[in-house]
Amino acid sequence: MDPLCTASSGPRKKRPRQVGASMASPPHDIKFQNLVLFILEKKMGTTRRNFLMELARRKGFRVENELSDSVTHIVAENNSGSEVLEWLQVQNIRASSQLELLDVSWLIESMGAGKPVEITGKHQLVVRTDYSATPNPGFQKTPPLAVKKISQYACQRKTTLNNYNHIFTDAFEILAENSEFKENEVSYVTFMRAASVLKSLPFTIISMKDTEGIPCLGDKVKCIIEEIIEDGESSEVKAVLNDERYQSFKLFTSVFGVGLKTSEKWFRMGFRSLSKIMSDKTLKFTKMQKAGFLYYEDLVSCVTRAEAEAVGVLVKEAVWAFLPDAFVTMTGGFRRGKKIGHDVDFLITSPGSAEDEEQLLPKVINLWEKKGLLLYYDLVESTFEKFKLPSRQVDTLDHFQKCFLILKLHHQRVDSSKSNQQEGKTWKAIRVDLVMCPYENRAFALLGWTGSRQFERDIRRYATHERKMMLDNHALYDKTKRVFLKAESEEEIFAHLGLDYIEPWERNA
């Protein structure tokens, strides 16, 4: 039996040829006459489908609004081959063996290349062996969705907070952190890429066979996975957790303002506890470190979403008091859907004058100081140059004006039932980062400050290695055409890169 044919219990009604848009003259020149595409709306949504249809037509592809006899390729997103066939069956349509069922990644790659790319296994949608009454031995069972479509780049994978492989990703994140403490960049990247790709899997790794074909899993990584499968833990991770240097660095860097160099210094001096450090009269602390110690208990505890939203109200009230047309967007982990975090980041931009933008953060700081809400601040002035090429580094910071603060958040702002008359401390110290960017750079800044860190590293790496472009928080530059590519939204940046758009909550790589 043809694997792309659905079982029919009775005579099939002849499908009428669709008319209307599919028969109308195309609005764009068709470059590839032998390909006729139909983009399935199921699980994709009308807006995204219309966007992809228009983009594909502009690239010279023939795309039908309705499914017709002339269609040669059905393109779907987040659907298996079986789901597409089930949809066709509901429509009373029998799929020909000549009809290609493809993942949207094929269309994205083709548009990026400016021509149809070769169809490989990673593009083809897989049909379950148990789909029809007569199983076809030519089709393999799962993990179809897993291995066949996984990219080495996090920007081509959807990674939600539903992590099915915590036992492995937790281990690799500990090893990555230890590598970072030792300033071993190669090991850090190896472990972070492994953790990132495992987070994106829609199934749990239960045997080494499940790792076949998954990128970013080298021999060392696979040895650790195998040990965890067999023993329930990794001896290397266990050794790291018991390592005095790791424990000390973990403790020291938990203090706001303390980095690797200071941690190394304190460790070499023999310090192993914060109490000994704070009581040592010979040590000198920066203004940031003093604030870090002073509000340590608050800052080391997690910020809840309710607290983050309450801070958001504070920020918007202050910003809009001076710049009513400003856009204030919460970024970072909270924009990606996380329920807790260590700080709250906000991106601020305005279509108004540059002079108003430059003066905003000092005015906001002054306002909070007068209200008694400002516990600490560090204002970093902008060094942004409009026509400077994006950085070649995948981990570089941007040059926008920014302010790192610690704000006093009263409990009553989070929970109105809590009275100001309550005993004890009535507020919590919260770390807040404010970033002010020019209006025309807002899309790039939003993409960069949303994260995750691994997602941003990979989308910049992808731009460089796959598209011959340079991307950072400021701009996107096409090295081939030698032009800056403008973007009004994150969606447009993805489109420039030939990437399928990934929502913020799917960037938890």
Curated annotation (Swiss-Prot):
What biological-process terms (Gene Ontology) are attached? DNA metabolic process; DNA modification; double-strand break repair via nonhomologous end joining
The organism encoding this protein is Bos taurus
Which metal ions or organic cofactors does this protein require, according to UniProt?
A: Mg(2+)
Give a GO molecular function annotation for the protein: DNA binding
The record's SUPFAM superfamilies line, in alphabetical order, gives:
BRCT domain, DNA polymerase beta, N-terminal domain-like, Nucleotidyltransferase, PsbU/PolX domain-like
Gene3D superfamilies assigned to the protein according to its UniProt record, in alphabetical order: 5' to 3' exonuclease, C-terminal subdomain (1.10.150.20), Beta Polymerase, domain 2 (3.30.460.10), BRCT domain (3.40.50.10190), DNA polymerase beta, N-terminal domain-like (1.10.150.110), DNA polymerase, thumb domain (3.30.210.10)
Q: Please tell me where a 2'-deoxyribonucleoside 5'-triphosphate binds in this chain.
A: G333, F334, R335, R336, G337, K338, H342, D343, V344, D345, G448, W449
For this protein, the record's PANTHER family field holds: DNA NUCLEOTIDYLEXOTRANSFERASE, DNA POLYMERASE TYPE-X FAMILY MEMBER
The gene designation is DNTT
- Family membership, please give it: Belongs to the DNA polymerase type-X family.
Q: What is this protein called?
A: DNA nucleotidylexotransferase
Per UniProt, subcellular location reads as: Nucleus
Region (Involved in DNA binding) residue spans: 258-262
Q: How does this polypeptide assemble, per the annotation?
A: Interacts with PRP19 and DNTTIP1. Forms a ternary complex with DNTTIP2 and core histone. Released from this complex by PCNA. Interacts with TRERF1.
Q: How is the cofactor bound?
A: Can also utilize other divalent cations, such as Mn(2+) and Co(2+) (in vitro).
Q: What does the record give as EC number? A: 2.7.7.31
Function as written in the Swiss-Prot or TrEMBL entry: Template-independent DNA polymerase which catalyzes the random addition of deoxynucleoside 5'-triphosphate to the 3'-end of a DNA initiator. One of the in vivo functions of this enzyme is the addition of nucleotides at the junction (N region) of rearranged Ig heavy chain and T-cell receptor gene segments during the maturation of B- and T-cells.
A single GO CC term for this protein reads:
nucleus
Top-level division of the source organism's lineage: Eukaryota
Give the main EC class: transferase
**Disordered: where is this region?**
1-25
What keywords would UniProt list here?
Answer: Magnesium, Metal-binding, Nucleotidyltransferase, Nucleus, Terminal addition, Transferase
- Chain positions covered by the region annotation Mediates interaction with DNTTIP2: 151-509
Where the record annotates domain BRCT, the positions are 27-124
Report whether Cell inner membrane shows up as a keyword of the record: no
Q: Where is this motif: Nuclear localization signal?
A: 11-17
